[in-house]
């Protein structure tokens, strides 16, 4: 068995988290390499392991990405996370809709394919403003990451530039969510390995606020409201898939006195290894390792 850490051409061998995982598994006696995904398809053999990591940018060519994933499955490659999790997690609107029984940021589908004029796009968005009872929306593609085509749309301001970009990309499906002012205080993320919540991360992605370094938070120190949502999510995942994902990150946003789930990351979640204690990094890596040697 060989372990491949899947990366992209731009990032292969350059991401600290990838390098740490590679070295950790080499130290356990495994053959482990960081390789771009399209090359892994060519060289991997049945029962090898592929961990999706710095494949950032897959959303730009997601159909090709899904074809590559299917080719891995056809070759009987062990994928982290497993195939069904990847297919479920790729479309934000679809998976968030399935989680609507939880405290998820209200999410509406924004389809612009049939529009011809900027005024039509504006009217559709204004209707969503009304439906969600908010002046300000966050708009982003259903399949996206890292702030790609993500806009803050305030109906009281001039939005010509945003509407123009939406019009240029109207072939994409978008989601619209109410903008939460508390985003400026950062997001709280929880990293879960094999169904066990390990630690939290206070993060400032820099999309609608200043970009700052993330900070580590012990899981025991996280708010009870977040722990409750994690428990409900675990029940859902176990019921739907029969197993927990090997690697999961759940991003929360503060709302008044509680918290909302903003996203659930299962495809290539950043685990923020560079910001957590060595002992926790070693624990997380070992737990991931156990998921593919059993």
Q: Which ranges hold each PLM region?
A:
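Nucleotide donor/acceptor-binding cores
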Residues: 1-2, 48
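Phosphate-binding site of ATP-dependent enzymes
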Residues: 148-236, 253, 260
């Amino acid at each position: 068995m060989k372990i491949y850490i899947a990366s992209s051409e731009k990032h292969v061998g350059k991401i600290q988290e990838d390098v740490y995982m590679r070295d950790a598994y080499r130290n356990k006696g495994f053959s482990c390499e960081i390789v771009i995904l399209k090359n892994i398809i060519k060289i991997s053999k049945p029962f090898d392991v592929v961990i999706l990591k710095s494949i950032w940018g897959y959303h730009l060519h997601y159909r090709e990405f899904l074809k590559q994933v299917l080719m891995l499955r056809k070759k009987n490659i062990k994928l982290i996370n497993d195939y069904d999790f990847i297919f479920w997690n790729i479309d934000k609107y679809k998976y968030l809709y399935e989680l609507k029984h939880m405290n998820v940021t209200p999410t509406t589908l924004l389809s612009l394919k049939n529009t011809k004029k900027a005024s039509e796009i504006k009217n559709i968005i204004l209707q969503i403003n009304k439906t969600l009872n908010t002046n300000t929306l966050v708009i982003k593609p259903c399949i996206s990451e890292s702030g790609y085509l993500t806009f803050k749309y305030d109906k009281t301001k001039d939005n010509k530039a945003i509407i123009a970009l939406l019009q240029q990309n109207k072939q994409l499906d978008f989601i619209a969510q109410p903008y939460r002012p508390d985003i400026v205080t950062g997001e709280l993320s929880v990293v879960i390995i094999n169904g066990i919540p390990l630690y939290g991360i206070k993060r400032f992605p820099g999309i609608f606020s200043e970009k700052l370094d993330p900070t580590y938070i012990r899981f025991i120190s996280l708010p009870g409201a977040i722990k409750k949502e994690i428990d409900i999510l675990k029940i859902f995942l176990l019921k739907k898939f029969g197993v927990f994902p090997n690697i999961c990150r759940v991003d929360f946003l503060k709302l008044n006195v509680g918290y909302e789930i903003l996203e659930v990351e299962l495809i290539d979640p950043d685990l923020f290894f560079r910001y957590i204690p060595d002992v926790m990094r070693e624990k997380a890596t070992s737990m991931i390792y156990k998921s593919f040697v059993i």
